[in-house]
Amino acid sequence: GDCFFKQVFNLIVEYIDSQPKYFVHRDYHSRNLMYPMESGMPGILDFQDAVHGPVSYDLVSLLKDAYIEWDEDVILDQAARYWEEARKVGLISNLDFSDFYKQFEFTGVQRHLKILGIFSRLSIRDKKNQYLENIPLIEKYLLSTTERYKELHPLRKILDKALLK
């Protein structure tokens, strides 16, 4: 029970903590991006909570967005492109793509658990029920990732019970 839960969370923290750190928006998703401005650059909103964080965090926020679902092949392709560019500019070194993608996925688990909590709080405390419609996509991300990695299976079992699936 609790022991497995703690082990899984410690593992998730290890994967997040092992990543190179740089500027992270922390809320980099579709609803915080504006169509390209006159300059041709997109407008980026809600950046006041930016921090120094794991290199894959904003990528997870964008590719496993709470509001838009991308096909898995698109996610893999874009993650690979990001990894290649990050290596070229020196953000990532000595890390093959499969290791980077695992870090990306574990970072996603942390982010998606946080989002489930935030959306639930917004509904229960603030009566903002519109976020509930996005929970199934977040659950889908969590269930597929926790199924894919053996180390996350204990969390998957907890999620199965909690989500009544």
Which residues does each PLM region occupy?
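ATP-dependent phospho-/nucleotidyl transfer catalytic cores
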Residues: 1-26, 34-38, 42-45, 133
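ATP/Mg2+ or Mg2+-diphosphate-binding catalytic cores
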Residues: 117-165
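Hydrophobic packing residues in well-ordered alpha-helices of helical domains and bundles
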Residues: 2-5, 75, 109, 131-135, ...
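Amphipathic, non-membrane alpha-helical segments in soluble helical-bundle scaffolds
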Residues: 49, 72, 102-109, 128, ...
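Histidine/acidic-rich helix-loop-helix segments that form or flank divalent-metal centers
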Residues: 93-102
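Active-site activation/catalytic loop segments of kinase-like enzymes and analogous catalytic loops
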Residues: 56-92, 106-125, 138-145
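Activation segment
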Residues: 36, 42, 50-52, 68
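Secondary-structure capping and boundary motifs in well-ordered enzyme cores
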Residues: 20, 25, 51-55, 101-109
